[in-house]
């Protein structure tokens, strides 16, 4: 399913890229698809594989038809490391600009992992006019920025889950728990990154506060943290019936134990 979606997205973006780049794309031996993201993390690694599978399928059929000429696709990836602990946004932006300048991709897919990097990187995408199909970063901040200047950011698209919709899903889950078990005391633990802060804050504001839940605490954790014992002890001591975790880092799996 994901491969078919990526395949369709690539074909669509090739059309857009051809319209934008024109003769420059046609003169190349192959059409370069850039994949700048956090390759060391599951989401980035699997997304990169999906792009490779999709392009292999396209190339096996002869490539894509560009003005009557069949052209093969070439995938070029770079590890932005923006999801890794301690990596500043400017460092990730250097990687994004480097792949554009050195590899000259006709289009970019997947894109930055962390929302902070995506929002800041939108200006780089706009500067070089490279169409980008983002599939990971979730903060609604990128949409707000696009709406502020749609002409400037018209090359940027996002197909993944928006944190706003995740709020609705989580609120629905909490409502079900309340209905089925009568629980109404929650302890919130979230990663200290844009999408997770927004998600935790909006669930509290839009659901917990209105539905009469008692929020016993909200703890934010830097990316890479693996010790959650202090908050768990607080949650137990205060009588929490539900813990709502909002993370994307692999270390959060420790909470299951």
Where are the predicted features?
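Short beta-strand segments enriched in small/hydrophobic residues
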Residues: 29-57, 112, 185-190
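Short, polar/charged alpha-helical segment
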Residues: 44-66, 201-208
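Bacterial N-terminal signal peptides that target proteins for export
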Residues: 1-10
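Boundary at the C-terminal end of the N-terminal hydrophobic targeting segment
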Residues: 19, 25-29
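Extracellular/periplasmic bilobed ligand-binding domains
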Residues: 120-129, 200-257
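Bacterial N-terminal signal peptides
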Residues: 9-21
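Extracytoplasmic ligand/sensor domains, especially the bilobed periplasmic-binding protein
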Residues: 105-218
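Beta-alpha junction/loop-to-helix N-cap segments that form part of ligand/metal-binding clefts
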Residues: 28, 43-49, 64-147, 159, ...
């Amino acid at each position: 399913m994901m491969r078919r979606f990526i395949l369709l997205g690539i074909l669509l973006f090739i059309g857009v890229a051809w319209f934008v780049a024109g003769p420059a794309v046609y003169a190349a031996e192959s059409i370069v698809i850039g994949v700048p993201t956090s390759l060391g993390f599951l989401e980035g690694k699997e997304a990169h594989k999906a792009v490779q599978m999709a392009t292999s399928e396209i190339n096996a059929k002869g490539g894509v038809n560009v003005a009557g000429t069949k052209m093969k696709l070439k995938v070029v990836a770079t590890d932005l490391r923006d999801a890794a602990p301690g990596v500043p946004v400017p460092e990730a932006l250097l990687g994004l600009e480097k792949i554009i300048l050195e590899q000259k991709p006709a289009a970019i897919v997947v894109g930055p992992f962390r929302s902070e990097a995506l929002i800041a990187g939108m200006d780089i995408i706009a500067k070089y006019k490279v169409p980008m199909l983002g599939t990971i970063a979730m903060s609604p901040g990128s949409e707000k920025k696009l709406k502020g200047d749609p002409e400037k950011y018209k090359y940027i698209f996002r197909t993944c889950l928006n944190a706003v919709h995740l709020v609705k899903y989580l609120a629905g889950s909490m409502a079900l728990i309340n209905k089925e078990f009568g629980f109404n005391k929650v302890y919130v633990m979230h990663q200290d990154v844009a999408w997770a802060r927004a998600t935790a804050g909006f669930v509290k504001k839009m659901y917990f506060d209105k539905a009469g839940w008692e929020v016993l605490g909200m703890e934010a954790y830097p990316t890479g943290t693996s010790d959650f014992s202090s908050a768990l002890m607080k949650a137990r001591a205060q009588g929490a019936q539900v813990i709502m975790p909002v993370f994307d880092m692999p270390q959060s799996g420790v909470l299951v134990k």
